[in-house]
């Protein structure tokens, strides 16, 4: 069992399996349905928009999945879930409190960034924390939210902020155009400074459009008074060891967002005028100088150790997200 589980873990992530099964519409409370689905699902029957390498990876370990799922079902995992896990999860959710006006303000800011464009209907609603360094979002609102993410003491100890997660994940509901993604690829192909840092970010399972979301989350949180300027700087410095070099540039210019302009439109305008091949390093230095004043723009060793991995890493390779040019974590 462990050998097969290790093989599965080396190829796919739990979120991929959860998201695939949620697309089936099958019951998550019926072990037989789960076992049957992963043993027999036809990749060609899936909607074209969700197909990709992540589906092929799941198919490559189908035999191992079938074996492990059958053994879990035979061992009574469904009963364990209902009697031990679900009550704990439900209690954590019921005990969590947030003021309705705070949620309303967050939603208003996200809507403003949408600039009249519709938000992705499959936006993140519920959040899973597999371990302290890997929080990720799932598509299906009927999945659980673990006590770790909501527990105040754990949040203080590991610098986990559920509302930051909430804002960050819901910003992934903003759509970006193919034109902007092409601009991002052109930048990667033609700017050495950006490409070097982007390759490092990808080694963390991030990169791509993640810098846009990091910048937007800090912008929204700062506008709402949830954080101060130092916290903006800290996030830029330590998120994936400071490799998302577009984040401070985007953050610097977000106050120039025009009335009614979408986030996509703003970013395309920014790429046209500021974020151009050969100019990223100078723009990054200017943005960091504005954020940091005289403080150096490289993270200290202590800062890097504190949060080399962001506490709200995303589920990798779920079906293509409108705000990702490639699967991210």
Residues of each region from the PLM?
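Post-HEXXH active-site segment of zinc metalloproteases
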Residues: 176-205
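Pan-zinc metallopeptidase signature
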Residues: 217, 225-307, 311-314, 318, ...
